[in-house]
Structures are given as C-alpha cells and as structure tokens.
C-alpha cells in the first residue's frame, strides 16, 4: 500500500513537471508533429518522424472550419477521434508515455537524494547524469510515439469513414 501511495504522488509530481519537461524537449511533441518545416517531408525529430503531417493538418483545419486552428485545438480533435476507438493502440502509447514520465521524475528525485549525500563522489555525478539523461530521452521518445499514434489513428479513422 505504501508503494502505491508513493507511486501515486510521484505520478502527480510528474504531471506537474510536464511543462518543464516539454521545454527541455523543445516543445510539446504534438505541437512539433503538427509543425511543417519548409523543404522537409516529415515532422518530428530524428528518431520519431511523422510523414503525414500535411494531410493531417489539412483535414483537421477543414473539419474544425478554422484555417488558423492552433496546434492544441487540432491535436485535441485528433485525440477525441482516437480515444473514441477501442481498436487503436493509443491507450497503450499513452500509458507508456505516462510511465516513462514517472521514471524520469523518479530518476530526478533519486539523483537529488544521492547527490545531496554523495556530492563529493565524482562517479555518482556521472551515474546520476547518465540515468537522468537516459530517462529524459526515453520520455521524449515516448511522448512523440504517443502523439504520432494519436494522429495516425485519427487519419486512419477519417480514411475509413471516406471509403464507406
């Protein structure tokens, strides 16, 4: 029961730190996936790419009847479609992102505790930086995978609706 309560509070803390994490990642993955770059046929970053951004943006703006729709508004609409379908992998990707965010928060907390006690040990700094970096990188990737899956599920649902 104690582990559950601790996990519950770490999950809450990780939710509070979400905006800070996004700043270190260069922005929200959903915003970056919905931002086209001139001369590039994909959005995202080197490890997680989304090749259907222009199609998704076009369909979302038409559906929202708003040629200046914000990225948040577009992603919110895509989420409403993908969450409405139990055949998608979106809940799995969401859970993986939430879990990796909790792991990142836990690694930060543990590093602070370790380094406050062993601040004179140079190797502890290396271990802490390595663990936090790996957790941060994994969290970033999972955020992009989740956002890409939401947009992919949205496009799949729209395409299926147009063929029936």
Language model features by range: what are they?
Residues 16-85:
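Charge-rich cytosolic interhelical loops and cytosolic tails of multi-pass membrane proteins
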Residues 117, 122-139:
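Transmembrane alpha-helical hairpins and terminal membrane-anchor modules
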Residues 38, 119, 160-164:
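Intrinsically disordered, low-complexity linkers and terminal tails enriched in Pro/Gly
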Residues 135-164:
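Cytosolic/matrix-facing juxtamembrane and C-terminal tails of multi-pass cellular membrane proteins
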Residues 2-9, 131-142:
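Hydrophobic alpha-helical membrane-associated segments
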Residues 1-22:
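Transmembrane alpha-helix/interfacial motif
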Residues 76-123:
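Transmembrane alpha-helical segments and their cytosolic interface motifs
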Residues 3-4, 105-113, 125, 129, ...:
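Short hydrophobic alpha-helical transmembrane segments
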């Amino acid at each position: 029961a104690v582990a559950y309560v601790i996990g519950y509070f770490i999950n809450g803390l990780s939710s509070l730190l979400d905006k800070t994490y996004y700043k270190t990642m260069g922005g929200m993955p959903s915003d970056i996936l919905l931002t086209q770059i001139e001369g590039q046929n994909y959005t995202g970053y080197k490890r997680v790419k989304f090749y259907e951004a222009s199609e998704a943006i076009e369909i979302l703006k038409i559906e929202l009847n708003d040629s200046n729709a914000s990225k948040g508004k577009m992603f919110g609409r895509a989420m409403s479609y993908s969450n409405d379908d139990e055949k998608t992998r979106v809940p799995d990707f969401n859970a993986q992102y939430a879990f990796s965010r909790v792991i990142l928060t836990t690694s930060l907390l543990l590093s602070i505790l370790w380094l406050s006690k062993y601040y004179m040990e140079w190797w502890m700094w290396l271990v802490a930086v390595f663990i936090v970096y790996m957790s941060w990188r994994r969290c970033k990737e999972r955020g992009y995978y989740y956002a890409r899956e939401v947009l992919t599920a949205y496009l799949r649902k729209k395409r299926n609706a147009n063929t029936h």
